[in-house]
Regions:
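Alpha/beta catalytic barrel-like cores
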Residues: 1-67, 75-77, 127-143, 147-226
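Eukaryote-skewed repeat-based solenoidal scaffolds used as protein-protein interaction platforms
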Residues: 69, 73-142
């Protein structure tokens, strides 16, 4: 199990310990979100904004025991040049992360509302495979669930990919879990879908039951494949 933290969460404490150390004590692997948001759309994609202080953040994160990073860009339409640029940027940042001895999760998200999703998936796969050939270390990938189940099998099987995880990307949890179950070797990295049924006014028992049900459903989608 892993947890992706915001920078301010990483810098906080839990039970008198830094949050990353507290997570590690419970067997949870900490990652940090490093991107600073998205640029305006160009060529059908939104690249990541510049991260001029990234090396300093990575050094601090590593010292706190953080295992890896996550960085998100968005693909809105099937523009070959745009998708190539988004993937190239992801790998460029990934190499910077690897240089600090950390594991990057590359996240070129395909917008599930795109009218050209299937074409986006195909171009993304081609560009990912092309860039992976130039890698001498493993990376992780966080991808939108594809239109055609099994589209990303070649990434799941690639020797330079440690793990492929899926984002829920706007799907409601039941639908996200059904789509996840159709894709072998891919596990969930859901946030919105995990938390969607939780409410502030719930009692502790209600909260625990709702969260437990969500975890069980997501676990089934990750492990019981159609």
């Amino acid at each position: 199990i892993g947890a992706i933290l915001f920078e301010r969460t990483m810098d906080g404490t839990a039970g008198g310990k830094p949050v990353p150390a507290a997570l590690l004590d419970k067997g949870v692997v900490p990652f940090i979100k490093i991107d600073k948001g998205l640029e305006a759309e160009e060529n059908g994609v939104q690249l990541m904004k510049p991260m001029p202080e990234l090396d300093a953040l990575l050094a601090r994160s590593k010292a706190l025991g953080v295992f890896g990073t996550k960085e998100r860009s968005v693909i809105n339409s099937a523009n070959g040049a745009g998708i190539a640029a988004a993937v190239a940027q992801q790998f460029e940042v990934g190499r910077q992360v690897l240089a600090h001895g950390m594991m990057p999760i590359l996240e070129p998200e395909v917008n599930i509302k795109s009218e050209t999703r299937a074409e986006c998936d195909a171009i993304l796969l081609e560009e990912m495979l092309k860039n992976l050939e130039g890698m001498d270390q493993q990376v992780m990938l966080k991808l939108s669930l594809p239109v055609q189940p099994g589209t990303f099998d070649a990434l799941v099987d690639h020797p330079k990919v440690l793990r492929v995880v899926a984002l829920s990307g706007g799907y409601k949890r039941p639908e996200a879990c059904v789509e996840l179950s159709k894709n072998r070797g891919i596990i969930a990295s859901f946030s919105r879908a995990l938390l969607e049924d939780l409410r502030h006014q719930m009692s502790q028992d209600e909260f625990d039951a709702a969260l437990g049900e969500a975890i069980d459903q997501i676990h089934r989608g990750s492990t019981q494949k159609a």
